[in-house]
């Protein structure tokens, strides 16, 4: 029933769901596409001419890590160093509905009302396209490989994006 309601609610949009392990940069990537890093910039971009996207929480599974408001009153996905997002949340940009999700492998926190990974798995089939983020500092995690195999097996349209490759760590 929830799936039917979700599909009906979002049917006139291209639904892109971003998911991946904790610390892979899902919310940061969403905020980038929504224009967070351009709206106050001196760089002239299309974001200056558009209405700011409306951010909405679809389903929350914890009391923290949903949407947050900056000092200018603009709403964005909450970003943090690890295991921050606790909701299925989205914004709409023209005909695109960008869905942010909790990290796979998220640890249960006190007060969680649902398992974060179960929530992610429930919403994957509803997306027109899944963008699966892999953190370059943790390549080849078994869980990541399982998700890539699942996407392939189920015929889910998907892209794999390697994140944080611009950050060099000294060993």
Regions found by a protein language model. Name each.
Residues 25, 107, 168-169:
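Short catalytic/ligand-binding loop motif for oxyanion handling, primarily in non-cytosolic enzymes
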Residues 8, 112, 140:
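Residue-level marker of regulatory loop/turn positions in helix-turn-helix DNA-binding domains and
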Residues 22, 102-104, 136-137, 165:
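Conserved Walker B
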Residues 104-112:
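Flexible beta-alpha connector loops of hexameric P-loop NTPases
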Residues 90, 95-96, 118-171:
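Conserved C-terminal guanine-recognition region of P-loop GTPase G domains, centered on the G4
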